[in-house]
Amino acid sequence: MKQFDSSLLHDKLKEYFGFSSFKGNQEAVIRNVLEGKDTFVLMPTGGGKSLCYQLPAMLMDGVAIVISPLIALMKNQVDAMRTYSNDAGIAHFLNSSMNKSAVAQVRNDVLEGRTKLLYFAPESLTKEDNVAFLRKVKVSFYAIDEAHCISEWGHDFRPEYRRIRPIINEILSLIHISEPTRLRRIS
């Protein structure tokens, strides 16, 4: 695994995202992700949680899989990542609303190594064809975005979230929650 000193991380932050400095504990979180450590992040809205998986995805080999509950949020994240790159294939999402041609294009971009971030709803991630596809892909890490929804909306919300753990051995949770006690309910 590559080592990234603080100076290099700051250089890459500027190069990829145009920021001169990290917010709060972003750098420590990013370093943990780069070192392959499971990481649970508590940050307020606007705290920069997304960058905590976006920058490592850009720096690591393979594609980062981001599990998100809302298609609109996935689309916003993909659109934002594409503004930072000249390659529209840098980020994609896969969901049930896509036609076969669009799914094939996304999968092709992933297999060619163009895609660094691939977003799924939990229902899409747990579909057998997507599980089979991901077995062919070098995955850099997994992130669960907006995991607080599991706690706030109850464990009956999106039962597919319970099926993620058997599919993924190590899950990186990047979440927005207001109280640490929810960690126990989410896990």
Q: Which residues does each predicted region cover?
A:
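Walker A/P-loop NTP-binding motif
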Residues: 34-35, 47-63, 80-82
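Pre-Walker A (Motif I) flank of P-loop NTPase domains
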Residues: 35-41, 62-63, 115-116, 174
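Conserved nucleic-acid-binding Ia/Ib motif block in the N-terminal RecA-like helicase ATPase lobe
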Residues: 65, 71-119
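Conserved helicase/translocase P-loop NTPase motor core
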Residues: 114-130
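SF2 helicase catalytic motif II
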Residues: 130-174
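Single conserved hydrophobic/aromatic residue that forms the stacking wall/gate
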Residues: 175-187
